[in-house]
Each structure stands twice: as C-alpha cells, then as structure tokens.
Amino acid sequence: MGPTISIGEALDRYDIDNARYAGSLQTDISAWLRLRNDDSQIIILHPDHRPPVKYEQDIFETESLVPAMNAARGVKDSYEIELIRKANIVSGLAHTAVLEKIGQMTNESDIAGLFLETCMTHGAPEQAYGIIAASGENGATLHYMKNNEDFGSRLSVCLDAGAEYECYASDVTRTFPISSTGEWPTTEARDIYLAVERMQEECIRMIKPGVRFRDVHIHASVVAVEELLKLGVFKEGNSVDEIMASGAVSVFFPHGLGHHVGLEVHDVSEQSVMAATDDMSPRMRARGFLMQPASMMSAALLEANMIVTVEPGIYFNRLALKNARTLPIARFIDFDVVERYYAIGGVRIEDDILVTTDGYENLTTAPKGDAALAIIRKSSVKNSRS
C-alpha cells in the first residue's frame, strides 16, 4: 500500500480545508455529538461510508452530497482548468514522442511503453486510464487494451492515451499510419481519416454555451453518413435522412460523441452530456464514449467552463457488421465495399474542449492530421541520417 501520507500532504494534494486520520473518527464524532443541535446531521457521500460505530440516533445524511458534488464538478474553476491544460500538455508531448518513433516500432507495446515513459519524465506518473494502442483491425475494438501485437503489414494505429496530472485527467486519441514516410498506405485509410477529421472539426466549431451536446452528436452522425455515402459504404440512392432514421450509422459510429473530463476521465456532472447515469461510481462505469445518447429533451446544455471531449470515430468491426447483415439496416450497406475497409480497423480523433463564454478553446496540444504526418516524415529523415 505504500506509506501513509501526512495531513499536510493530504491538504496539498486534494486541495481541501481539513483532514484527519481515520483513527480519530470515533472520538471526533463523539465530541461533535455533545455540541450539535438536535436537527444537525453529518453529511456523507455514500451509505457505505458510515463509520463502523453505532449511535443512538441516525445522524448520517446520505442523499444530498452526491448530487451537489456532481453539479459542482460539471463546471470547472480556473485552478481545475489549468491542471487539465497541464495534463493535456504532457499528453501532447507523449503523443509527439510516439509519432517521432513510429517508423522504428514493431509492436503495440513499443507505443504504450514510450507513451508512459514520456509522461513519467514530465511529472505525470499516472495515466488517466489504461493506454489503448490498437493497430490494424484492433482499432475496431473500442476497449482494446492488450497492446502486445506485432504490426506486421498493418496500416495504422488508433492511440487513445492521456496523462493524469495532480489528480486531473486528459483524454486524447490520435490515429496515424504505421509508416516511416508519413503517408497513408491506402486510399481507403486516408479517406476514412479525412471523414472523421471533418466530423471532429465541424463538431468542435459548434461548441459554445447553450448548445445541446446531443445536437452536436447528431451532427457528427450526419457527417459520417454523408462521408460513407460518398465512399460507397452506404449504397447510392439512399438519402441521409433515410439512413439516419434507420440507425444504420451506429454500426460504424457506435458510441456517443463525448463526455465531461475532470477528476475522472469520464467525469460526473449534474446531468451527463450524453445521459450517462451519474448515480454510480465513475470507476464502475463504462468508458464515456460508450454511454447511450439521451433523449432530445433530457440531454444537457453546455455551460461556460465545462470541459468535454469531442471524439468521433468510424469503425469497421467484423462482428458488428456480421450482425448487421441479419438486420433490416443491411439494405443500406454495401458489404462488398466494406471488405476494402476492414484492414483500417477504426479511426478516432479526440480532443478536450473547454467551453468559453463565447465559444470554445481546444486544450489538447497533441499533433493530428497533416501536422502529425509531417512529424513522422521529418523524424524518418532524421533517423535515416543518424
């Protein structure tokens, strides 16, 4: 378990007003009982936090603290924003380090190891979540975390990894070619990346106070349908509206557009932007991008100083597409065309976006798109000369 931290260390680490050792709890409560008003209660977070001591009266209130804390955590103060900004800076350095070395790497573990090492050397020894370094078709598995397969002839990597800094998370995903030339190895890989890039860029531009995040998610889905129609994945002759109404887009974009970021990578709030249930511990929840979209009326509105991810993706998951063949939505999908895209696995691009009073600020500094490809090319030339 390691050494017990001191009270001073606890005050500094958790930015709290008071801290006591657990051994003094019974004495402290007994002293409080002698002085309290008859209607006073001790407010605790969960029923299972009750001290293992019986009292004559029920002095513990367990209902009000969780929603109050959730509401407070949804909107960040300037101190929290700067810590999340710092976490993103460290993550950006780690993502850049991977891009600089990808041409020399041969296994997913090389990526995960370098990412973690870079974060640790820049003051962030903890990851906000388990690193996902998914090469080739592994990129179609949202929670792929084996990180141990050789690249072989695979086309690309979906790297979902973010540092934690002073208890605050970042959440960053980049997809890039496994290449020493900095070029997409196939037209199909490039086209899917550009489609997701368009999804993300248009959605980020929509972020501002008063916007219903569910509407931004719907826009991402519409763009995905438009792009997949252009590529022939959805059959010509079907309209965007028809495909959207059928739900067929969920085969390729099966998750929500984003979630809050804060003390947890999928942070709590008064009302989750994608209708996740906030009555369970964040550690016990599915990852944010797996939460089911809310109904139009229940989805939350964005407020200034919220920080949310914008993480669209397009995936070619063999199991999902095999199942789709048995469903009514199969009539919209050209499965012969789909065969050309399986090798891509999945493409996801994810940034952490601060909602400002009049728009947004992108806190994520990790290179993406053309900037990422340029780093791969430059590093390849440099490494060939050394």
From Swiss-Prot:
GO terms for molecular function: aminopeptidase activity; metal ion binding; metallopeptidase activity. Signal peptide: none annotated. Catalyzes the removal of a penultimate prolyl residue from the N-termini of peptides. Its EC number is 3.4.11.9. This is Probable Xaa-Pro aminopeptidase PMAA_074180. Pfam families: Peptidase_M24. Keywords: Aminopeptidase, Hydrolase, Manganese, Metal-binding, Metalloprotease, Protease. Its cofactor is Mn(2+). Belongs to the peptidase M24B family. It comes from Talaromyces marneffei (strain ATCC 18224 / CBS 334.59 / QM 7333). Binds 2 manganese ions per subunit. It comes from the Eukaryota. SUPFAM superfamilies: Creatinase/aminopeptidase (SSF55920). Gene3D superfamilies: Creatinase/methionine aminopeptidase superfamily. Mn(2+) 2 binds at D160, D171, E350. It catalyses: Release of any N-terminal amino acid, including proline, that is linked to proline, even from a dipeptide or tripeptide. Mn(2+) 1 binds at D171, E311, E350. One of its GO terms (biological process) is proteolysis.
